């Protein structure tokens, strides 16, 4: 069994990308080919992605849109608070994290952004239910701030409001971006279309739990956060057509991967084929997992000891990912949300931990 320490590495802090590059496709792309030993690592630019995939392949994108989910405000007593919307649960209700000197009780009124009041409802650990006086999405968009990841050290500005969204984001509901998609611009998508690469979308609303650290050495004891996803019938049909013509299903980002594999695992366990699905998932993919749908993965470089590093290690192989990350650090790749990307291929032979 792998432990948390197996997924640790030393990352020079200056390699954590603090801002987006001027052009989305200006990022670098590390293509990882583990069909040879040792794995072949090819340094590319992201704009070269079309040369790495084939006509008839299917790219699966997550079309979630990041909410302006961060608010600063105060209690009736004048005490300062910070609120992060975790998810919208109804037209006028949402779940949120609240930072305050003392947790507010049910019935408490909070003033947000000096613009409107919300009422605290029941506690749904670790979140609070908030009741909004007008439709949540309207007030969030008008008065909230974009919630950048904790390792980005500046407050969101006008540039972030554009660059921390994918160009195809259309379904508001996330509190973090599906960052592998940030590298795609419209000209690149048009090039992929022209060469016969298929595209499809699903929705997974990324929650704040994506930044939750793993606090147990035995990773089997870690409990994943839950996120809502929607896998439409049009995507199911495109996956079937891709399989029929011998193409690859390529997930753009770990969120697309998690939604696809969650739906496929549920179908497998029920003894039925993949079908359109709307559900919650807390799928936790670690080495030894049997992948059912995804053949290749476009992804960014992830945090040490993170569940996403475990996911890519399960997909491409622990030793392959270790070698790729060593190479990326040596070659000064940019890491995390605004960083560079990798193109991985599924390893079909599970690895055992080293003695």
Swiss-Prot record:
Pfam families: Queuosine_synth. It comes from the Bacteria. InterPro entries: QueA, QueA_dom1, QueA_dom2, QueA_sf. Transmembrane segments: none annotated. GO terms for biological process: queuosine biosynthetic process; tRNA wobble guanine modification. GO terms for molecular function: S-adenosylmethionine:tRNA ribosyltransferase-isomerase activity. Its EC number is 2.4.99.17. Disulfide bonds: none annotated. It catalyses: 7-aminomethyl-7-carbaguanosine(34) in tRNA + S-adenosyl-L-methionine = epoxyqueuosine(34) in tRNA + adenine + L-methionine + 2 H(+). SUPFAM superfamilies: QueA-like. It is found in: Cytoplasm. Pathway: tRNA modification; tRNA-queuosine biosynthesis. It is an enzyme of class 2 (transferase). Monomer. Transfers and isomerizes the ribose moiety from AdoMet to the 7-aminomethyl group of 7-deazaguanine (preQ1-tRNA) to give epoxyqueuosine (oQ-tRNA). Belongs to the QueA family. This is S-adenosylmethionine:tRNA ribosyltransferase-isomerase. It comes from Burkholderia ambifaria (strain MC40-6). The gene is queA.
């Amino acid at each position: 069994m792998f432990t948390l320490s197996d997924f640790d590495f030393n990352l020079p802090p200056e390699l954590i990308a603090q801002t987006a590059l001027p052009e989305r496709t200006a990022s670098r792309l590390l293509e990882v080919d583990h069909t040879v030993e040792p794995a072949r690592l090819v340094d590319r630019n992201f704009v070269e992605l079309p040369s790495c995939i084939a006509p008839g392949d299917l790219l699966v994108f997550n079309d979630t849109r990041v909410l302006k989910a961060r608010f600063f405000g105060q209690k009736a007593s004048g005490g300062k608070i910070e609120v992060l919307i975790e998810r919208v649960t109804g037209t006028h209700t949402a779940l949120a994290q609240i930072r305050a000197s003392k947790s507010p009780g049910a019935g408490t009124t909070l003033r947000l952004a000096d613009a409107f009041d919300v009422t605290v409802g029941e506690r749904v650990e670790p979140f609070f239910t908030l009741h909004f006086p007008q439709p949540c999405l309207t007030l969030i968009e008008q008065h909230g701030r974009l919630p950048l990841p904790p390792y980005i050290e500046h407050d969101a500005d006008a540039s972030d409001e554009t660059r921390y969204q994918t160009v195809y984001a259309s379904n508001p509901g996330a509190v973090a971006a599906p960052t592998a998609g940030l590298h795609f611009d419209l000209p690149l998508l048009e090039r992929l279309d022209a060469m016969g690469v298929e595209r499809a979308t699903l929705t997974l609303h990324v929650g704040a739990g994506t930044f939750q650290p793993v606090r147990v050495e035995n990773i089997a004891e870690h409990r994943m956060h839950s996120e809502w996803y929607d896998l439409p019938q049009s995507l199911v049909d495109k996956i079937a057509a891709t399989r029929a013509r011998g193409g690859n299903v390529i997930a753009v980002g770990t969120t697309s991967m998690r939604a696809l594999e969650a739906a496929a695992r549920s179908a497998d366990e029920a003894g039925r084929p993949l079908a359109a699905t709307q559900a919650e998932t807390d799928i936790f993919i670690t080495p030894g997992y049997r992948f059912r749908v995804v053949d290749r993965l476009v992804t960014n470089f992830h945090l040490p000891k993170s569940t996403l590093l475990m996911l890519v290690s399960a997909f491409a192989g622990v030793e392959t990912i270790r070698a790729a990350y060593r190479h990326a650090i040596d070659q000064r790749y940019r890491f995390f949300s605004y960083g560079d990307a990798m193109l991985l291929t599924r390893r079909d032979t599970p690895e055992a931990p080293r003695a």
